[in-house]
Amino acid sequence: MRPDVSTASPDQAKPAVELRGVEVAFRLADGTDYRAVRDIDLAIAPGEFVTIVGPTGCGKSTLLNAVAGLVSVRGAVRIFGSPLAGLNRRAGYLFQQDALMPWKTALANVAVALEPAGVSAGEARDRAGECLQRVGLANFMDRYPHQLSGGQRKRVALAQTLIRDPEILLMDEPFGPLDAQTRALMGDLLLSLWSADRKAVIFVTHDLDEAISLADRVVVMSAGPAARIIAEHRIDLPRPRVGADIRLAPRFHALQRAIWADLRDEVMRAYASGAAGAAA
């Protein structure tokens, strides 16, 4: 159930993430400046699931890094109404590639995420076990990364992120390396976890079907450099959702056509300009 703003805490009454006039630029190896994104205005409510799509090289990951506090920005980034200074410690970040330590079991890999918080070893193990149960790995806690499938490793990485109970989830194509069937299962798992916790989510993907099936809102970015937001689409599909079922709905296909109409020319422009070779 979404928070009722009339009775919500002061934090819940403010956007979980707010970007106003945000621009991110980098100095390239040859000394020239590269403006990755510009004029970004975006607000994400507590508990809202937002997906971001755009051509390769348009700065989708750069936006996530701005919200995480990993890059310097011009403009304003606010987290629950407060200006972001340094790392965003209210967010958890799930990358495309996991960072599991090969010498630790699944349980130990998840528990280690609590070490910086000074949590006792016993409590960390208990909480790690609970998180692994939530992601469907109750019978795999003692396995090492090389003994796990790609989907299982991704579940461990998700548990690593969730154990700190972040209020915001930043997800950078987290299911990209997985096969189609495993990717669909991970999407359904993520929706189930999100429905229970209702954290704010910003999810970057190249997969338009994935973007629609997961989100409350899909944000479309232009080709880079100096990419900007060109469209936003409210996803009015009923919840709870199962990805394989919702993709059969006529409304799903109507949304797909509408979003692709905004995205297609930008994808073609990116390929024509060579931006497809830049970092996302």
Residues of each region from the PLM?
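The feature captures the beta-strand-to-loop junction immediately N-terminal to the Walker
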Residues: V53-P55
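Helix-to-loop junction immediately C-terminal to a conserved catalytic motif
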Residues: A68
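Conserved ABC transporter NBD signature motif
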Residues: G75-G86, R127
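Conserved ABC ATPase "signature" region
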Residues: E115, G122-F140, S192
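Conserved signature/switch motifs of ABC ATPase nucleotide-binding domains
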Residues: R143-H146, R164
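Hydrophobic anchor residue at the start of the ABC signature
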Residues: L158
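Catalytic Walker B motif of ABC-type/P-loop ATPase nucleotide-binding domains
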Residues: L169-D172
